[in-house]
Design a protein with these regions (language model features):
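Exposed, low-structure sequence patches enriched in small/polar residues
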Residues: 1-302
Length: 302
């Protein structure tokens, strides 16, 4: 047994840790990265390019109800990605573009081997076989301006492709209680967003009529896993994490889950959101007016 310090004032001063009823999860995350970079510079433009390789070891140690288990020991995930960075700066323009890849460590809540019953109608539990995500990210930002007319444009673009995307397997039991467990998607997750704004564009020589416009949009494509048959709930009074994972997941590669043997099927969701607006401004010596219009469109496909 061990000892701990209570997080609250209690006259009874509980100081003995009950090993059987206590749970423990440790994520020993090790990432080794190697990069090969080259740089080119000419006047106001800088270009960096190359490639990177990552070796990621994600070892998870868990202990619950007196049973301990280690996953991922000695196993490495290899990630490869090109690298690109471009910047250009001048009196009229500033442009930056970047492409790189990176992995992300798992949070403890994703691998905890005990159910979270803080909400009795929505019960979640961790997955000790979960693997870290690896994302390839591209960003582009651009700003242009005209010092004579004061017209300008500002834009931004982001595209993200996530391998081993962490999503959730969801199901409801016969009493309407919802359960979910994090899993790695077999299909990559895609996200993109863009935005732009034009401003102070003169429509006549006197610059009394000025035009402006703005636009933005988002796109996402990902999957989740839903039950295809009625699945019984989890017996919380006699819960055993190892037995649960043998039914839900199968072997370390998740053979039962991904084959659909445990009752789950992949569902794909696409979401698109677009919005934009225009405005017209009149600026006279004694009178100023402004007219604007905006619209938004959302689309979801399952």
């Amino acid at each position: 047994s061990g000892s701990f310090v209570p997080g609250f004032s209690d006259k009874r001063e509980y100081t003995v840790l009950a090993e059987y009823w206590s749970s423990l999860s440790e994520n020993r995350y090790f990432r080794n990265t190697a990069q090969l970079l080259a740089q080119y510079r000419k006047e106001q433009t800088t270009v960096q390019f190359g490639a990177s390789a990552e070796a990621v070891n994600n070892e998870i140690y868990t202990k619950s109800y007196g049973i301990s288990r280690t996953t991922g020991k000695g196993e490495y995930l290899w990630n490869y990605s090109p690298f690109l960075y471009i910047s250009h700066s001048s009196e009229k323009a500033f442009i930056v573009a970047r492409y790189n890849g990176t992995s992300k460590a798992l949070s403890n809540s994703l691998i905890t081997p005990v159910p979270d019953i803080s909400n009795p109608t929505f019960i979640s539990m961790g997955n000790i076989y979960l693997e870290p995500e690896f994302s390839n990210n591209f960003t582009l930002s651009a700003n242009f301006n005209n010092k004579k007319t004061f017209a300008y444009f500002s834009g931004y673009l982001m595209v993200d492709n996530v391998n081993r995307n962490i999503v959730y397997a969801n199901w409801f039991d016969e009493e309407g209680v919802q359960y979910n467990v994090p899993v790695n998607s077999k299909k990559a997750g895609n996200r993109a967003s863009f935005s732009g704004q034009f401003g102070s564009i003169p429509l006549n020589e006197k610059k009394s009529f000025l035009f402006g416009a703005s636009f933005s949009g988002t796109y996402s494509r990902g999957c989740s896993y839903q039950n295809i048959n009625r699945i019984k709930g989890v017996d919380m009074d006699n819960f055993n994490y190892s037995s649960f994972m043998e039914w839900f997941w199968g072997n370390s590669a998740g053979d039962r889950f991904y084959s659909g043997e445990s009752g789950f099927k992949e569902s794909l969701t696409k979401r698109i959101s677009l919005s934009g607006g225009v405005n017209l401004r009149y600026k006279g010596e004694r009178f100023t007016s402004r007219v604007s219009f905006s619209a938004t469109r959302d689309m979801v496909e399952y």
